[in-house]
Each structure stands twice: as structure tokens, then as C-alpha cells.
């Protein structure tokens, strides 16, 4: 909004002056200004909101000679409008009336009580049940020459209070943001760091908010510690600067302290198996390549009974630990749950978990004093159910350390439960303003006021009986409505019997309504009691919220344990329902999967063909050939998914599986243009390949699918050959290398650590049947024309392709420099790889092939065909005897 001069400001009405002062403090935020039962927006805010929310744009008179553009939303429906705006990346300042209109001189006092931004959501109506919302701040660290040396990250889940720090290399920013998926990113004013497209809504804040010394002190104050040494964060200067800005911003949006942010976790990139953005996308962990939520690994695994468990599952899938100890502990717990006795059966446990509330988010709202009555009743009911839940798992905790730890953490906070039980009504109203929230017996004054209000009915019945007897009016009625209060109604024909102390209150067509001194006295007392009861209830509710604040750490402890128990039980249910097994781990290099299955694809088809996959020190690269649609990509992805599931702690879809150390998983599968980044399909492909070649280690799992297909045949083949050799000779990583360049199948002759496998298929007439079985050795052809036919390519095109294929094969056979000569040893100055020799095809075609080309089968008689067959056999034997391959 344009800054107004003092003269222009003075020309506005007092109410608009109040609005403009508030708006000046929130220039980049939509201000929802409370006026009665509506939140109003003015000037540019009104125009923007009308456009985004499809509201009617009106005018409200004029101020300073200018028409006031205005749009509004009803206060009772504000959450649905906030949800829409937040999804669009907008922020909204909620300005409430905090003064009393009856006593205010001039405009009622108003104040911004909170600011709703994409990264600071806590209201249940604004949050997705199964997705965490993160606010992230980033601060770049520079050396003395001003060169960026690292980026400090701090991110906060305000709904739960979870705060994390990390410092990364500048080139790792895209991968980190893909992993964290922040909803809002804070950066310093004037910063030149480019935020990747689609990473989240960005917000510029003053650069001084990122001051390292201030940030470190603010972080210590927040955690109530003297230093950050105990968290391992003392040396993360850039991250501490980011944390300072983060905490300052979050507290400002809430208008209060962040009481539930009391712990800190420092993340180290070596703690988790590395998954770059391409890998997370290609493996479809939580989102398909089409951008849908299902079918994905997450959608398959998420049978959690609580939303806390579902959110933890998403976190675990994106953060698989490198150390197998965590996975083994989780799998031990799954085994214990599967083997539990009848009184602690998995089904009974999951049935109990379905009654559990979202303790994590309720605790967050409690800490911010925004918990609603039904939040507290849900918290009470959950805590009351904990003893029975613990009893169900007590029989099996001895068999699993993880379950023993969960059991100990599920001890209900007794004092907290006592307070909730005594203070909150069994079934409270949704809002405090509706009354009926505080339990009877908790406060004597409130009970007395309620008795006065609730005993109105009996008083009116008694009064009606007395007045009928006193007046002789048999149809006299004593009633109440919100407009006229209490009254005595007498029909027209009986008004002559009305006593002198009746005072007319309302005249109707067929009746008169009166008030008496006795009824007026009771009315004042009853209505006053209702108002005072609501005010008392509001004060009591606020005091209960304050009294619950000391229990926040215990509530967080219980929430964490419930989420883990629920997720482990969901893993156990999946293992039982889908016939999965517990993997094993070894310190030796290698991957052994027997009869592995793609978990997601298997759930979509009637029958899935299981396949083995084996890697070791003597077998590091599998060259995978076979037809399109034959299952090469599925086989590659299933290997990576089974490995990831094993390290996450789940059972896996296989007959057996054993894994050595895995530090990263890379995928180079498919590609599309990066139009925004100005990169072609081939450039995207080569960029991903370069990252793999530069970063893969002997403990990395690499998936390479048809590398080199985005350029000319010879260029693509040369690159594929060189990349495969580099992965073998230098990276020595586990590699699944799918290709249609059959020339590459000769690599195992040069590198014993490479092996050929193929996806089998059989021809049926001009069609093809895919067997989806992985067999040793190379494929003999690609069946491209048959696949095209299956895809519905018109028959004339297929016939023309067959004819041209025959021509190309004839041309290739007669070439003196066949394509396979790429594998001949190049000059030493050009190729820095050792042992670059590879066998070449023979220069002259086989004489039997020459003979076959000259034959027209349709012109042969049966006897001639038989004679020709013997002649061809003689040619083959003669050719082999001369020493030809």
C-alpha cells in the first residue's frame, strides 16, 4: 500500500486511521480486519482477495475523498478462506476486536493476534492430516574472500515443535529442499541465493535477523540452555544464524512464545542414505511421476491407524538411516508384534490405536494456547486409554528393545489426566463461547450460575400456574424469546382480566404480551446469570490451558511413542498381509535378493513374476537387456525399493534378502525437458549421469536406464559404453545398467565384475509375450516392432518398418566398419581408461546368410527346400571349420 503523508492520513476517518496503522505494520500481508460478524479487507487487499477468493468487491463510502474498496468473509467461515489463501502461498494477519464496544470512545480497540503463513500452520482446519508443514530459514556462510562455503538450514514443524539444523554444501541445496519439502522459506533481504523452482513459498526478512551471535543466543534461550554443545550445534554457525531468524519469525506470527519448541536435532548427511531429487521422484516414494499420491510406496505402506503414524512413515521413507542398527531394531519389533500372543494380538492393538487422537498436534495447539475444548477432551480420552494399550504390548516388550522403549514412553502423565478429567465436560461444545465446556463440580461459582439459568423452566411453570389462579385466565402463558425476553401472553378476549401490575410489552394481532415486576426481576437475574456463566467459563478454560503448559514435554513424549508404535504395527500388518520377510544385514559388500518383487506393482496386478538380484565384490554391474515393456525398469526399481525398505526398517517383498552397507541410491531413469531451466532432455540426462559418476562410491546403488538414448546412435552408444566402464573401473558401485545397445553385452569379457542378464520374451506369430523373468546372459533381440504393434501402431507402418529393418540389417552386414568397432582400442591419448580393447564383428558376412538373401521361399518346391536346407548346413560347417566365429 502506498505510504500516506500525515496530511492525507489525517483526512481519513478514525476507524480507517486505525486500519491504516495496522496495515503499515503488515505491508506484504493480507489483513483480515474484524468488524462485527465479518472480517473485512480494504483497498488493494480487498481487490486481491476478491480476485483470489472470488469475493464480491464493494465500496464502503469514502475516506479522505477516496472510495473505499472492500471485500469480506464471515467470521464463522474464515478457516476455509484461510486454507485457500495459504495454498496459494499468501499470508494473512488476523486482526481482532479486543476492546469492549460498549465502553469504547471512538473505534473499538483492535490488534493483530496472529499471522497465518504457509509455514506456520497449527489449526486442524488448515493442516493436512498426513503431511507435516515446515518453516525453513537458510543462511549462507562465506569465507574471508566472500565465497560461499556452506548453507545453514534451520527448519521447524510448528504444529509439533520439532526443530532441526543442518549445514550443507551450496550445491546440495536442491537435494536438501526436496527432502525437507518446506512450505515456506525465509531468506535475508539482499541475498543472491537462488531457490529452486517449486521449493516452497519464499519470504524475505531483514538481514540482521540472521546475525549469528544473536541467533545462537536466541536458540539457547529457546531451549533454556547455556550452550549448544550438548546438541552438537556449537560449530554450526550458519545454521544458528538461520535458526535465529526462524524463531523470531515464528514467534512473531503467533504473537507469543513457542513453549513447545524445547528440543533440537542436528542432521548430518552421513546419517541417512543419500537420495537425490531424481531418485525420490523416480522411485515414486510419496508421489507418482504423474504427481498423484497413489500408487506409491507410501500409499501401499500407509495402513496406520493414527495420523501421527502416517506422518512418521513419510519422514522415515525420506530419511532411511545408513546404520543397519536402527532398521534391525524396528524389524525386531515387527517380528515381536507378528508373534504376539492372543491377548496382545496385532489386530487388537491396531483396534485400540484407532481410538487415539492426534496428540502431537493437540500438544502444539495447547502450547500456543489455541487448543479448543474438543482437543482437550480428545487428549483426556487418549491418556485414559494408555494403560490398556500398554497392557497389550507388555507381554512382548521383552522380545524387542524398540517396543520396551515405546512402552516406557507411554506412561500417562497422571496429573495432566486428572486435571483434564475434572475440568473438561465429557462431551464439550466445539467452542468455548457456546458454553458447556467446563465439567460440573469443577467450579462452585459456575455451577451456581448454571443452576440459575437451567432452573428457569421450573420457575416459569410455577409462575404460570400462580398467574392463572390469580387472574382466572385459563389460557395464560409465560414464555421467552431472544428479542423480547420473558413475557406473559394473554389472548384478546381475556385482556379485561389483566391485573394492574401487568405492563404491556408487545401487542400482537390476537394477543397482548405483558411483563410483571416479579418476572422482570427474574429476567434480569436469569439473563445476567447466562452472561456471567459464559464469562466465568471462558476464564476457567483459559486457566486450564495455562495449568496444562507444564505437561507439554510429557505430552510430546507420549505423542512420539504413539506414532512409532502405530507405524511399527502398520509395518507388521503389511508384512503379514503381503507375505514379506525380514531382511538381514552384513558388513560385507553385497546385495542378495531371492525372489524379489516390486511392492507397488505387485499390488496392482493379479500375478507378479519374482526375480533374483545378486551383487558382490566379484559382481558389481548387471547389464540388463530385453524388450521394451519386458520389465527392465520394474526390476531395477524393485531392487532399489527393497533396499530402501530394508534400511527404513520394514519387512521386504522377497523370499529372502541380505544387504551390505549402502550409502546412497542414485537413479537415471527417464527424463523430460527442463523448460524453466533451459535444459533439453539429453542435458537433463547427462546432468544426472554426471552426478552419479562424480559421487557414487563402492557402497552406492546406481540405477541406469537406457543412458545415451537422447542423442545420435553412435554418440549415445559411445557415452553408454564409457559410462558403464567408468562405473566399473572407478566407482565400483552396485550398478543396474539397462540398455538397448546390445554391443555393451560384450563388457563382461573385459570386466569380470560385469554380468549380463536379460528379461525374457517369446514371439507368437508377429506378436510377443513378455515373461518378465530375469535370466542370465544377454537378450537376443529387442522386439521393438512387436512392442510397437502392441501399442496400436497401424499395420501399414509396422509392415513398412519390417521392410526397412531388413534393409538396415543388410546394410549393416555389408559395412566394412560396423557399429561394434566402437569397442576397438582407441588411441591412448584419447582414452584414459585402461584395457579399452573389445572384440569387433567379422568384416565379411556368413556365406549361409548370403545364400539365404538370394532365396525366395514362395518359389521353392518341397524337395528343393529340403535340398537347400542340407546345403545351408554344409556351408555353416565349412565356415566353422575354417576358424570363423
Swiss-Prot record:
InterPro entries: DNA_mismatch_repair_MutS, DNA_mismatch_repair_MutS-lik_N, DNA_mismatch_repair_MutS/MSH, DNA_mismatch_repair_MutS_C, DNA_mismatch_repair_MutS_clamp, DNA_mismatch_repair_MutS_core, DNA_mismatch_repair_MutS_N, DNA_mismatch_repair_MutS_sf. GO terms for biological process: mismatch repair. Keywords: ATP-binding, DNA damage, DNA repair, DNA-binding, Nucleotide-binding. The keyword DNA damage applies. The keyword ATP-binding applies. GO terms for molecular function: ATP binding; ATP-dependent DNA damage sensor activity; damaged DNA binding; mismatched DNA binding. CDD domains: ABC_MutS1 (cd03284). ATP binds at residues 626-633. GO terms for cellular component: cytosol. It comes from the Bacteria. It holds the Pfam family MutS_IV. Belongs to the DNA mismatch repair MutS family. This protein is involved in the repair of mismatches in DNA. It is possible that it carries out the mismatch recognition step. This protein has a weak ATPase activity. PANTHER family: DNA MISMATCH REPAIR PROTEIN MSH1, MITOCHONDRIAL, DNA MISMATCH REPAIR PROTEIN MUTS FAMILY MEMBER. This is DNA mismatch repair protein MutS. The lineage of its organism: Bacteria, Pseudomonadati, Pseudomonadota, Betaproteobacteria, Burkholderiales. The gene is mutS.
Amino acid at each position: 500500500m502506498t505510504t500516506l503523508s500525515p496530511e492525507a492520513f489525517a483526512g481519513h476517518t478514525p476507524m480507517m486511521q486505525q486500519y491504516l496503522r495496522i496495515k503499515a505494520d503488515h505491508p506484504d500481508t493480507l489483513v483480515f480486519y474484524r468488524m462485527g460478524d465479518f472480517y473485512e479487507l480494504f483497498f488493494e487487499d480487498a481487490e486481491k482477495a476478491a480476485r483470489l477468493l472470488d469475493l464480491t468487491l464493494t465500496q464502503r463510502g469514502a475516506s479522505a475523498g477516496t472510495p473505499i474498496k472492500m471485500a469480506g468473509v464471515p467470521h464463522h467461515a474464515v478457516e476455509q478462506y484461510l486454507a485457500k489463501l495459504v495454498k496459494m502461498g499468501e499470508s494473512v494477519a488476523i486482526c481482532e476486536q479486543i476492546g469492549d464496544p460498549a465502553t469504547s470512545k471512538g473505534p473499538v480497540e483492535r490488534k493483530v493476534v496472529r499471522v497465518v503463513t504457509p509455514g506456520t500452520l497449527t489449526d486442524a482446519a488448515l493442516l493436512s492430516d498426513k503431511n507435516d508443514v515446515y518453516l525453513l530459514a537458510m543462511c549462507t556462510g562465506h569465507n574471508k574472500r566472500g565465497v560461499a562455503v556452506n548453507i545453514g538450514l534451520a527448519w521447524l514443524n510448528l504444529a509439533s515443535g520439532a526443530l532441526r539444523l543442518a549445514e550443507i554444501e551450496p550445491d546440495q541445496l536442491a537435494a536438501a529442499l526436496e527432502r525437507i519439502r518446506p512450505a515456506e522459506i525465509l531468506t535475508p533481504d539482499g541475498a543472491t541465493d537462488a531457490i529452486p523452482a517449486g521449493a516452497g513459498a519464499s519470504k524475505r526478512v531483514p538481514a540482521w535477523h540472521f546475525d549469528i551471535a544473536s541467533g545462537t543466543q536466541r536458540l539457547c534461550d529457546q531451549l533454556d540452555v547455556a550452550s549448544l554443545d550438548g546438541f552438537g550445534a556449537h560449530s554450526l554457525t550458519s545454521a544458528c544464524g538461520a535458526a535465529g531468524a526462524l524463531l523470531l519469525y515464528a514467534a512473531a506470527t503467533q504473537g507469543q512464545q513457542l513453549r513447545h519448541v524445547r528440543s533440537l536435532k542436528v542432521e548430518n548427511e552421513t546419517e541417512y542414505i543419500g537420495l537425490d531429487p531424481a531418485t525420490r521422484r523416480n522411485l515414486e516414494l510419496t508421489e507418482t511421476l504423474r504427481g498423484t499420491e497413489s500408487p506409491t510406496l507410501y500409499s501401499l505402506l500407509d495402513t496406520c491407524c493414527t495420523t501421527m503414524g502416517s506422518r512418521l512413515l513419510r519422514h522415515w521413507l525420506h530419511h532411511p538411516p545408513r546404520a543397519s542398527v536402527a532398521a534391525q531394531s524396528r524389524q525386531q519389533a515387527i517380528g515381536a508384534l507378528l508373534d504376539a500372543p492372543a491377548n496382545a494380538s496385532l489386530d487388537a492393538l491396531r483396534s485400540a490405536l484407532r481410538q487415539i487422537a492426534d496428540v502431537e498436534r493437540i500438544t502444539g495447539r495447547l502450547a500456543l494456547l489455541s487448543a479448543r475444548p474438543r482437543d482437550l477432551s480428545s487428549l483426556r480420552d487418549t491418556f485414559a486409554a494408555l494403560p490398556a494399550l500398554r497392557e497389550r504390548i507388555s507381554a512382548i516388550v521383552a522380545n524387542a528393545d524398540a517396543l520396551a522403549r515405546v512402552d516406557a514412553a507411554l506412561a500417562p502423565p497422571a496429573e495432566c489426566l486428572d486435571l483434564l478429567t475434572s475440568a473438561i465436560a465429557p462431551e464439550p461444545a466445539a467452542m468455548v463461547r457456546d458454553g458447556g465446556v467446563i465439567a460440573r463440580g469443577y467450579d462452585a461459582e459456575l455451577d451456581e450460575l448454571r443452576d440459575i439459568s437451567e432452573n428457569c423452566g421450573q420457575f416459569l411453570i410455577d409462575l404460570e400456574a400462580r398467574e392463572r389462579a390469580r387472574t382466572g385466565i385459563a389460557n395464560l402463558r409465560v414464555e421467552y424469546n431472544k428479542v423480547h425476553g420473558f413475557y406473559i401472553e394473554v389472548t384478546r378476549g381475556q385482556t379485561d382480566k389483566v391485573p394492574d401490575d401487568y405492563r404491556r410489552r408487545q401487542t400482537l394481532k390476537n394477543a397482548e404480551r405483558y411483563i410483571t415486576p416479579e418476572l422482570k426481576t427474574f429476567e434480569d437475574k436469569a439473563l445476567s446469570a447466562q452472561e456471567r456463566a459464559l464469562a466465568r467459563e471462558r476464564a476457567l478454560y483459559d486457566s486450564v490451558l495455562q495449568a496444562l503448559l507444564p505437561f507439554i514435554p510429557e505430552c510430546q513424549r507420549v505423542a512420539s511413542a504413539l506414532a512409532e508404535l502405530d507405524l511399527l504395527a502398520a509395518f507388521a500388518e503389511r508384512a503379514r498381509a503381503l507375505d514379506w520377510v525380514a531382511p538381514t544385514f552384513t558388513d560385507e559388500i553385497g546385495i542378495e535378493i531371492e525372489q524379489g518383487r516390486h511392492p507397488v506393482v505387485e499390488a496392482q496386478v493379479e500375478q507378479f513374476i519374482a526375480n533374483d538380484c545378486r551383487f558382490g565384490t566379484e559382481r558389481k554391474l548387471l547389464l540388463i537387456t530385453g524388450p521394451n515393456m519386458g520389465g527392465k525398469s520394474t526390476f531395477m526399481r524393485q531392487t532399489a525399493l527393497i533396499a530402501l525398505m530394508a534400511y527404513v526398517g520394514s519387512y521386504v517383498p522377497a523370499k529372502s534378502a541380505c544387504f551390505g552397507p549402502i550409502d546412497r541410491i542414485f537413479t537415471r531413469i527417464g527424463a523430460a525437458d527442463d523448460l524453466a531451466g533451459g535444459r533439453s532432455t539429453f542435458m537433463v540426462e547427462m546432468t544426472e549421469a554426471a552426478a552419479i559418476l562424480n559421487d557414487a562410491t563402492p557402497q552406492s546403488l546406481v540405477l541406469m536406464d537406457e543412458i545415451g538414448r537422447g542423442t545420435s546412435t553412435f554418440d549415445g552408444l559411445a557415452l553408454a559404453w564409457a559410462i558403464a566402464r567408468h562405473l566399473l573401473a572407478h566407482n565400483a558401485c552396485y550398478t543396474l545398467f539397462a540398455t538397448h545397445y546390445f554391443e555393451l553385452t560384450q563388457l563382461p569379457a573385459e570386466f569380470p565384475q560385469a554380468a549380463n542378464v536379460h528379461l525374457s520374451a517369446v514371439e507368437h506369430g508377429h506378436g510377443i509375450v513378455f515373461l518378465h523373468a530375469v535370466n542370465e546372459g544377454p537378450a537376443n533381440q529387442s522386439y521393438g516392432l512387436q512392442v510397437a504393434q502392441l501399442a496400436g501402431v497401424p499395420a501399414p507402418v509396422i509392415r513398412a518398418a519390417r521392410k526397412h529393418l531388413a534393409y538396415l540389417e543388410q546394410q549393416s552386414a555389408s559395412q566394412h566398419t560396423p557399429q561394434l568397432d566402437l569397442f576397438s582400442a582407441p588411441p591412448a591419448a584419447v582414452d584414459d581408461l585402461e584395457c579399452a580393447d573389445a572384440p569387433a564383428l567379422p568384416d565379411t558376412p556368413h556365406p549361409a546368410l548370403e545364400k539365404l538373401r538370394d532365396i525366395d521361399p514362395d518359389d521353392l518346391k518341397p524337395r528343393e527346400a529340403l535340398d537347400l536346407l542340407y546345403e545351408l548346413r554344409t556351408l555353416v560347417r565349412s565356415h566353422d571349420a575354417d576358424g570363423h566365429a
